[in-house]
């Protein structure tokens, strides 16, 4: 690399690094808020630490309680507790040691026996402990509909009669307005005003609290007002404009407590310490209302500017380091990239690095159980995998569009003096329409080449009416053509091709293979065989192409999808001598083929042979020009079966050649070849892994519908990577097809639609490939009739089933929970986007059911 190019690259990398660092700084701009006062009115205090939970009967020790009370006594002289169950009954006694006043809580629930125990204990404590200054009978018991107003009033009257301190119940502010009769049975109004739960943005929340307080004072002028819960969570899902972040918690609380102090309100900040156990009752946000975390560490600064992520500088550095590592890998052997391609890759890499660091940081702020930790690790690994796939996709895009010139171009050789040895063309067929195969043989007979033979093998076709016409046609075409009918013959297509090798003419130096539906250009051998003059070349490959794209809308979409595979992926792979050998329009040096043979164990014997050629240190040549056109599948089920075979075969090859591909063990594969074989099939593997994401999304959505108050939508950060990959892949297809293939926008979207329709099929093939060792060879039928609509839809029944599940999950969440928050809307949108490949499959199935023009013409006319 020249010093000028290196300098330019360095400037670009530094500029983009500065851009993303600037973005980290932008979203972490300091915001000023009043300093925390020396004393606040009070804290709501639940004493549980990590690993402790009242639901499991796990209570803190007296020593732990003392540590908490000592810490809180430095900020307030008043605490509120919610129950006297377990060791919480010791809090009034211990609070006396630190001069703390206690608002004692009695937890009222549908459990009558527990209610009686709570009331008895609370009365005893209120009458014997100097620290108890008031008693609260029930906490949001009416709001939860766990007690009737009449029964709550009975409890209130009983406790008021039994104690000397003021008695009240604590409810959300609107419950007091709905049940004003409660005021006659309490000594003060204790109201919760929590703007977060009411979708109020943080910036409007202080005024919201003051307005509600004024309303209550106006409605109950003779009763003292206690704001028994005011607060803001530091983590959790958004509710409308209310965002649960540490920065918003800090700004809101620092502003609110100063305002309430100035105006003389009595209040309790909910809460002193984070309570992870509450997540099971209130959703994930329930764990994060503390001013201190569960380890008793202060969560935000009490003075000075508030920064959203105090550690943002370290995170920015980490994202830059991560991006630089990935970039160094992507730029290996990248000298052919133009500057625009390098800039594009640099930007995408820094974007991925920043998002990955953000995901890791955000998840690190969660309280984890073994279950959530396991899920989080799996999701994190999934996110890492998604970004690896995204980077490989971006790398392919850059090398397809922004490159100075192709490194290895194999143009047609037209010179008469060129090297043109004898060629043996092998045509395998099984149960193929005779008239179609005759067209293939006629095209071979018209080849403009001095010395070649054609060997046709029909293996295992049972009906003589199918193979005997081919035998007769070969005899008619002359001595160049030889026909073999062999039954039984094991090994599918690979077995048939292996059978022909010893029957090949002794003086043939090249063996060519075409499928039985391909009509070749007369110049195919003349233009391409001369490339074997290079002794290192073992394979010469021409792209697959098709001639029936105008027969139907279905085939037009299939044709658009095929073009990218053969005119984008193979072209970029050819630059590093890493093409995937196709089973048609391919030529192999005879000596190499005799040594290696076709792998009968592999369902994609062609691609497997090509890899073994590379492992021997030999090369392949790929031509851009089309020299033959075949027929595409006629139905969606056949289209799926063909792609299933390709994807299943890819996994077979990866498993069988893992040592060579992953470590280069026992082979002469270059790093570029290993990269392309792994990276090229990585998107298919990602499709396979996406099945697990879809299953997980459906299970999680079901939980959100069944227990909506306990299960929140997953963290948005984990839904972003698969969505980003989906839209990037679709955008990449559209962009590449327009730039590299030269098709119009309509055909580019057609390619994207056809590709999406195969996602489920590929996913199944990948999973079958990893968990099975072999499957039968799927022959792609030719000249098949279209199926009816119901048959076509039944061929996509799995896709239809999953689509209905995803749509049902989205609808169920909407009906049960609504769309109150951005993360809820995002999750529902994610479910709908996840359904798009399945919708595409149904569209393709429908199009394949439409009659082809010749079928329409054959229909009887109505009188």
Enumerate the predicted regions with their spans.
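Aromatic- and acid-rich polysaccharide-binding/catalytic face
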Residues: 104, 133, 171-212, 230-233
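The conserved acidic donor/metal-binding loop of glycosyltransferases
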Residues: 514-519
């Amino acid at each position: 690399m020249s010093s000028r190019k290196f300098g330019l690259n360095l400037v670009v990398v530094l500029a983009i690094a500065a851009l993303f660092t600037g973005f980290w700084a932008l979203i972490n701009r300091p915001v000023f808020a009043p300093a925390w006062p020396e004393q606040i009115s009070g804290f709501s205090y639940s004493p549980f630490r990590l690993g402790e939970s009242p639901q499991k009967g796990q209570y803190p020790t007296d020593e732990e309680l003392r540590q908490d009370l000592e810490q809180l006594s430095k900020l307030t002289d008043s605490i509120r507790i919610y129950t006297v169950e377990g060791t919480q009954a010791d809090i009034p006694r211990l609070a006396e040691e630190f001069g703390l006043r206690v608002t004692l809580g009695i937890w009222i629930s549908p459990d009558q026996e527990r209610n009686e125990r709570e009331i008895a204990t609370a009365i005893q404590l209120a009458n014997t402990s100097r620290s108890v200054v008031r008693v609260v009978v029930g906490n949001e018991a009416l709001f939860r509909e766990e007690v009737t107003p009449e029964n709550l009033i009975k409890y209130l009257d009983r406790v008021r009669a039994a104690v000397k301190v003021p008695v009240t119940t604590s409810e959300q502010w609107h419950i007091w307005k709905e049940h004003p009769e409660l005021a006659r049975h309490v000594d003060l109004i204790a109201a919760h005003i929590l703007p977060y739960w009411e979708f109020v943005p943080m910036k409007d929340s202080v005024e919201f609290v003051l307005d509600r307080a004024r309303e209550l004072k106006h409605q109950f002028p003779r009763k003292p007002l206690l704001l028994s819960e005011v607060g803001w969570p530091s983590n959790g899902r958004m509710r409308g404009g209310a965002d649960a972040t540490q920065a918003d918690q800090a700004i809101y609380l620092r502003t609110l407590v100063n305002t309430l102090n100035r105006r003389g309100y009595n209040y309790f900040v909910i809460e002193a310490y984070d309570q992870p156990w509450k997540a099971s009752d209130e959703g994930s946000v329930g764990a994060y209302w503390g001013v201190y975390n569960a380890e008793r560490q202060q969560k935000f600064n009490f003075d000075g500017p508030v920064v959203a992520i105090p550690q943002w500088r370290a995170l920015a550095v980490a994202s830059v380091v991560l991006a630089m590592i990935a970039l160094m890998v992507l730029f290996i052997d990248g000298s052919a990239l133009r500057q625009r391609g390098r800039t594009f890759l640099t930007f995408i890499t820094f974007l991925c690095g920043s998002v990955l660091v953000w995901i890791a940081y955000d998840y690190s702020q969660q309280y984890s159980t073994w279950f959530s930790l396991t899920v989080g690790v799996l999701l994190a690994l999934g996110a890492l995998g998604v970004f690896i796939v995204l980077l490989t996709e971006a790398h392919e895009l850059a090398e397809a569009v922004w490159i100075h010139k192709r490194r290895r171009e194999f143009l047609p050789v037209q010179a008469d003096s060129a090297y043109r040895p004898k060629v043996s063309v092998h045509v395998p067929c099984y149960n193929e329409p005779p008239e179609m195969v005759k067209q293939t043989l006629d095209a071979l007979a018209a080849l403009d080449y001095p010395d070649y033979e054609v060997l046709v093998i029909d293996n295992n076709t049972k009906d003589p009416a199918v193979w005997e016409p081919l035998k007769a046609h070969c005899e008619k075409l002359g001595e160049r053509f030889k026909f073999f009918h062999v039954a039984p013959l094991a090994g599918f297509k690979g077995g048939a091709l292996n059978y022909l090798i010893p029957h090949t003419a002794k003086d043939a130096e090249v063996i060519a293979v075409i499928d039985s539906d391909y009509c070749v250009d007369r110049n195919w051998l003349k233009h391409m065989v001369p490339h074997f003059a290079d002794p290192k070349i073992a394979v010469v490959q021409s792209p697959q192409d098709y001639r029936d794209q105008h027969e139907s809308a279905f085939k037009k979409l299939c044709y658009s999808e095929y073009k990218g595979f053969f005119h984008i992926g193979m072209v970029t792979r050819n630059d590093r001598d890493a093409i995937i050998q196709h089973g048609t329009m391919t030529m192999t040096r005879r000596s190499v083929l005799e040594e290696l043979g076709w792998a009968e164990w592999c369902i994609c014997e062609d691609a497997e042979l090509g890899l073994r050629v590379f492992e021997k240190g030999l090369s392949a040549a790929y031509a851009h020009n089309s020299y033959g056109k075949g027929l595409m599948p006629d139905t969606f089920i056949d289209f799926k079966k063909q792609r299933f075979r390709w994807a299943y075969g890819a996994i077979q090859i990866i498993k069988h050649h893992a040592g060579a591909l992953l470590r280069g063990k026992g082979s002469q594969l270059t790093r570029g070849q290993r990269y392309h074989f792994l990276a090229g099939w990585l998107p298919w593997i990602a499709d396979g892994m996406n099945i697990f994401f879809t299953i997980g999304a459906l299970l999680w959505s079901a939980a959100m519908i069944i227990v909506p108050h306990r299960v929140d939508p997953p963290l948005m950060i984990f839904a972003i990577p698969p969505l980003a990959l989906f839209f990037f892949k679709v955008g990449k297809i559209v962009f590449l097809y327009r730039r590299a293939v030269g098709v119009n926008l309509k055909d580019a979207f057609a390619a994207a639609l056809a590709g999406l329709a195969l996602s489920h099929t590929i996913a199944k093939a990948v999973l079958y490939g990893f968990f099975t060792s072999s499957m039968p060879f799927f022959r792609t039928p030719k000249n098949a009739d279209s199926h009816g609509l119901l048959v076509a839809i039944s061929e996509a029944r799995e896709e239809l089933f999953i689509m209905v599940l995803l749509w049902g999950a989205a609808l169920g969440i909407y009906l049960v929970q609504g769309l109150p928050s951005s993360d809820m809307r995002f999750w529902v949108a994610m479910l709908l986007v996840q359904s798009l490949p399945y919708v595409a499959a149904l569209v393709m199935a429908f199009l394949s059911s439409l009659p082809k023009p010749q079928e329409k013409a054959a229909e009887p006319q109505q009188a």
